[in-house]
């Protein structure tokens, strides 16, 4: 049984994240979606909100695999958190060459610190390549329609957040 660790801020989860998660489930029997907690950052959604949105999005999009996915928080090194959760794979999504350059550096450092944990790069699908959580937050804050970029529960939460 292979466990994959999929770290990110997921603020909010996008269709791009969901695309990578579906691919990861084709490789690993269990995927841990790991929300990074950074004390110096102020996310739009709290950890509990992000975890709930991810769980609701997954129950709608992947109901048959719900038992194969866990959502956790981490505030330490990715490789240490992955090891704590019994993961042997780190999942990283790639949208373009810029992502690849950055992720290759990170993979190299992670391999030095944890040679037992492999990094798995998964390319974003064509439709999700331009999507970033930052752009989704900005568009939603300006009243734009982001329904094509995020799962339904996330869209509803963004609408509620920006009407408040």
UniProtKB/Swiss-Prot annotation:
One of the GO biological process terms: coenzyme A biosynthetic process
Gene Ontology annotations for the cellular component aspect, listed alphabetically: cytoplasm
Site positions (Transition state stabilizer): 17
EC number: 2.7.7.3
Catalytic activity, reaction form: (R)-4'-phosphopantetheine + ATP + H(+) = 3'-dephospho-CoA + diphosphate
Function: Reversibly transfers an adenylyl group from ATP to 4'-phosphopantetheine, yielding dephospho-CoA (dPCoA) and pyrophosphate.
Protein name: Phosphopantetheine adenylyltransferase
């Amino acid at each position: 049984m292979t466990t994959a660790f999929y770290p990110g801020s997921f603020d909010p989860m996008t269709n791009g994240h969901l695309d990578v998660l579906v691919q990861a489930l084709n490789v690993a029997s269990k995927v841990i979606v790991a929300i990074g907690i950074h004390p110096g950052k102020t996310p739009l959604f709290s950890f509990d909100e992000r975890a709930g949105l991810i769980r609701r999005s997954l129950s709608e999009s992947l109901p048959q695999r719900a038992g194969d996915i866990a959502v956790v928080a981490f505030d330490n090194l990715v490789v240490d958190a992955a090891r704590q959760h019994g993961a042997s794979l780190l999942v990283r999504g790639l949208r373009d060459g810029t992502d690849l350059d950055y992720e290759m550096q990170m993979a190299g450092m992670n391999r030095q610190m944890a040679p037992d944990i492999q990094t798995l790069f998964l390319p974003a699908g064509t439709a999700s390549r331009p999507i970033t959580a930052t752009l989704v937050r900005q568009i939603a804050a300006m009243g734009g329609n982001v329904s094509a970029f995020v799962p339904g529960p996330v869209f509803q939460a963004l609408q509620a957040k920006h009407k408040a």
